[in-house]
Amino acid sequence: MGKRRGGRELARGLSKRQRKHLRQFGEQHPVCDRVSGRPEATQICELSDNSDKSSAESDSETEVEQVSVYHKLLATLKASPESESEEEEDESESEEAGESEAELDSEGSQEPKEAVGGEEEQNDVPEQEEEVAAKDPPEQAFGQEEADGVETSCDPNRGAIEEFTDVKHEAEFSLETNFMEEESGDCDADKRESNSSQAFSEDPFKQHMDKELEEKEVEKISTLSKTSSQSKWPRLGQLTFSSTLEKHTTLKPDKEFSVKQLYLHKPLESTWPKVNKHYLSSASKPSDSFFTPLQRELFCIMNTYRDLFYPERNALTNGEEIRHAYCLHALNHILKANAQVLSNNAKKRDQKPGTDSDDYRDQGLTRPKVLMIVPFRECALRIVHIFISLLEVNEKRKIDVSNKKRFKGEFGSDPDEKPPNLKRPEDYEAVFAGNIDDHFRIGVAILQKSMRLYAPFYSSDIIIASPLGMRTIIGTEGEKKRDFDFLSSIEMLIIDQADIYLMQNWEHVLHLMRHINLLPLDSHGVDFSRVRMPNLNNWSKYYRQTLLFSALQDPQINAIFNKHCFNYVGQVAVRNVPLSGSISRVVVQLPHVFRRIEAENLTSVIDTRFQFFIDKVLPEYRDAIMSHTLIYVPSYFDYVRLRNYFKKEELNFTHICEYTKKAGICRARRSFLKGEKQFLLLTERFHFYKRYTIKGIRNLIFYELPTYSHFYSEICNMMKATDSGVDATWTCTVLYSKYDAQKLAAVVGIDRTAQMLQSKKNVHLFVTGENE
């Protein structure tokens, strides 16, 4: 917040665009200033001063990395969707001309060369791709080019977060120097512990963490394939249980629910009903006043420490229910783990000198136990608020939260920054609510009566971060300042809203999974006599529970769950099939022609699709009669390839992607609406982050099925936005292959998908809408 106030003091004498960006981010945009060609470009000096000042204020743990090609590309990120002005949707020429002059702020990332020449100079992108690809693998180069969509942080040294780390409360939150009696204030702690020893031995936490695997079992998990079984639960639906060890197979939902069966640590048993009451139905039975039906079944699985994949998370309906459930599970795990350490501290303090025992092995090689990956700062803010609410027994017993004010300032949002008449779909508003900066990481340390925000990672119990925030601290091979030792002993990994990372940069998620649960390069002052044997044997990954939540089924998300999760207890995946697809929500009268592409293998699909498009599909639309043709392209790589081909063939087209400036977007939309351009290439990530209504569509081509099934109906329904009276000529063509089975089922339904994939015919027709 302080940066924003400082920015307002510098607002005098700035242009409209600069004042707008200064109000949003508290600093001048370095890319805009560098390429604008206006006298205001000298404002870069002020940005440098602010940046230096901020660096001086940050502590020694601040991540300062060399400015590489990766960081330069990341530095070109732009403002969030909520920074759009009210006149975005206005199609008039006068206002669009005004936007071209005064509203050149972001729509994603701008390439420096592209910014100089405007929309028509976007051929420079492939050249930069080649430069990056020379140093990085293809997936990483793509991620660097895309640079995570609507990032609100415009730091020119994007790889370095201006971090604050709390160093004042180290002793107060140290697990090595505190004891159970001091933490709980209960003189009868030992007596209570002895009375509940039998119950504690039945605790799923105790059973899971104290299990000692044999080498044969580890080898079996590593080499053999999993055996799976099916089960149907009342709320979750069809479940697939898989495990390598035969004794860990299926699980049945509890018919009779008892709070004691949850083994919740104090004070969660008393605070949870108050925190969760907002999501409970007034018609619920008294016995169901603890969980919603969804939470009950999810927590039943979570509490057994199995891996869980739930691909039906919806930001509008059940998103917060799920967030509360996994926060309860994570906090319960942390409180139990810390209580065990503090209790053993007291026992070890009282034991006779010279006596060693393996009974006190209760820790990992590093302290962080829970890693929570979320897409935006707003998500981290909500998680911390849930933690605080769960730890506060009542209004009189508030817990001490260090650096709470700073946390609210950096992770909160200003409601006045959002344009009042910005109209977007409800699901968009739910996903992009609050602070949508996607570059952050924060450590949280918890004891029963207090919480420490901004704790150093090696003194944290929980790390909440975005994939980009983790990527910039993990670094890459050869970088001097990189660190991932703090990930060595992660016992619980929670990846929420995994589908959004497909729109940001999936390579960051893969990079994280490759660096989790590795042996640390340094000891970091650990007491090896307290470290569990599985951690010393480098078997941490076999004990890690992974909770994966997504809004959709996707092969890349499935690969994370199948190839990077090794939990010895087993895995549970929700595998419900869509009975009716999103095509049923298309309201316009429209023939949908689905054309199947025959590809020999998965790697050849990309080239086969391109060749099929230019040989079979595009010639049908070259005629001037087939004007107003929108081509929807999910992959940015395919978009660049098509754009270059269209330019080579000198076709009359325009294009919009996540890197296009607002002025270019306005020109493209206007020329497409008026018919000046026959084709419009549109990327899926642009639609995800902006959700503009593209007017003037008469012919629609889905180069590939959309990642989000509801995007299919949204794009099709855009045709009704133009009252041209020529709806009889509307067409829709969709390309698909047998490798698109999940996406196809989400669009047309599982029954039609089976017929379309097994049929000898390669063309299938569906008609939507009512006859007039």
Curated annotation (Swiss-Prot):
One Gene Ontology term of the molecular function aspect: rRNA binding
Modified residues (Phosphoserine): 58, 92
Record-linked Pfam families: Utp25_C, UTP25_NTPase-like
Record's keyword terms, sorted: Developmental protein, Nucleus, Phosphoprotein
Biased composition (Acidic residues): 83-108, 117-131
Compositionally biased region (Basic residues): 14-23
Region described as Disordered: 1-208
InterPro entries: P-loop_NTPase, UTP25, UTP25_C, UTP25_NTPase-like
Keyword Phosphoprotein: yes
UniProt main location, coarse: nucleus
Annotated Gene Ontology cellular component terms: nucleolus; small-subunit processome
Compositional bias of kind Basic and acidic residues: 24-37
Subcellular location: Nucleus, Nucleolus
GO annotation, biological process: embryonic organ development; maturation of SSU-rRNA from tricistronic rRNA transcript (SSU-rRNA, 5.8S rRNA, LSU-rRNA); positive regulation of embryonic development; protein catabolic process; protein destabilization; protein localization to nucleolus
Residues covered by region (Promotes p53/TP53 degradation): 1-200, 588-650
Subunit note: Interacts with CAPN3; the interaction is required for CAPN3 translocation to the nucleolus.
Its job: Component of the ribosomal small subunit processome for the biogenesis of ribosomes, functions in pre-ribosomal RNA (pre-rRNA) processing. Essential for embryonic development in part through the regulation of p53 pathway. Controls the expansion growth of digestive organs and liver. Also involved in the sympathetic neuronal development. Mediates, with CAPN3, the proteasome-independent degradation of p53/TP53.
Family assignment from sequence similarity: Belongs to the UTP25 family.
Record-given protein name: U3 small nucleolar RNA-associated protein 25 homolog
Organism: Gallus gallus (Chicken)
